Design a protein with these regions (language model features):
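RNase H-like (RuvC/DEDD) metal-dependent nuclease/polynucleotide-processing core
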Residues: 2-7, 11-292
């Protein structure tokens, strides 16, 4: 598919007013030099609300491919249910987003952690409040395929360094807001190309795909980042490229936008398992057959 521009967004689900972990990288269709987009209004950091307003304000005459680093849905295919044995459990991804949003309406800035306080639903999460009795280390089909390169953390886990669940809760609220502005892949058909497309990304996968691993205490070096960018047909970042904090969120955003542009040219990266209509799919994970 052809796009006018690409955004790679390293995500954060934390409760703060501003999210230090949100970084936004951009490439246009003619450029091979990715750049970091600064937050609006001279703020030092983005927050989720300002980012969503920014995405809504983009030129409607252009088509963008936008990648968010969070799981777009929960496992479904293993038990044919997101929340096993829960009455009125949602049965589609869009109903799931609305469900998560509804149980967090009192929270500003798209924070999603209030669901841990809803008695029956909280039992499915490993959260900062408690480990629910129905919590399971479940995996989506796309995560099973990704495991050949590196394994994502379980989406119901919201505790510890591998906790992706908090980001997904906030992210699903965001998808519920943006679903009328953009096609969200792979849940929507992509016939309306004017709307642009939002996909799920996994920055670690894009590094590991080329056997690039961070050092234990220092993270990715500039040389490693540039080696990875070269694999995705992008120019290196300059020696003045800055990364702040141990998570190197800028590096994740930069490699993601390069990978997005690279993968978008190849039809095989738009193919998914049939279960992806319920669970979502990590963009860049190659699907081979339905035998899972």
């Amino acid at each position: 598919m052809l796009f006018d521009g690409f955004f790679g967004i390293d995500w954060s689900g934390d409760k703060s007013k501003f999210q230090k972990g949100i970084k936004v990288a951009y490439l246009d269709k003619t450029n091979i030099n990715p750049k970091i987009i600064a937050p609006p209004n001279k703020n030092r950091y983005w927050n989720r609300s300002s980012l969503i307003e920014y995405l809504k304000s983009l030129n409607s005459n252009k088509s963008y491919l936008i990648g968010f680093d969070f799981a777009f849905a929960y496992p479904f295919e293993d038990y044919k249910n997101y929340f096993i044995d829960l009455n009125n459990s949602p049965d589609s991804a869009k109903k799931l987003w609305d469900f998560i949003d509804f149980h967090n309406l009192e929270n500003s800035n798209y924070y999603g952690g209030n669901i841990w306080e809803k008695k029956s639903i909280s039992e499915y999460y490993n959260s900062p409040i408690k480990r629910g009795v129905k919590f399971k280390s479940r995996r989506r089909i796309t995560e099973i395929y990704a495991k050949q390169i590196c394994s994502p953390s379980p989406t119901f886990n919201c505790v510890g360094p591998g906790a992706v669940g908090t980001g997904s809760l906030a992210g699903m609220r965001v998808l519920n807001t943006l679903k009328n502005n953009y096609n969200i892949w792979p849940f929507d058909n992509l016939k309306n190309k004017k709307k642009g497309v939002i996909v799920e990304i996994f920055p670690t996968l894009y590094f590991r795909k080329h056997s690039i691993k961070p050092k234990k205490n220092t993270g990715y070096s500039l040389n490693q980042i540039n080696d990875a960018l070269k694999k995705y047909d992008c120019l290196p970042v300059s020696k003045n490229f800055k990364m702040f904090g141990p998570d190197q969120d800028e590096a994740d955003a930069i490699i993601s936008v390069a990978a997005l542009k690279y993968f978008s040219k190849y039809i095989q990266y738009w193919k998914t398992h049939k279960g992806a209509k319920k669970e979502g799919w990590i963009y860049g994970v190659k699907f081979t057959n339905d035998k899972v």
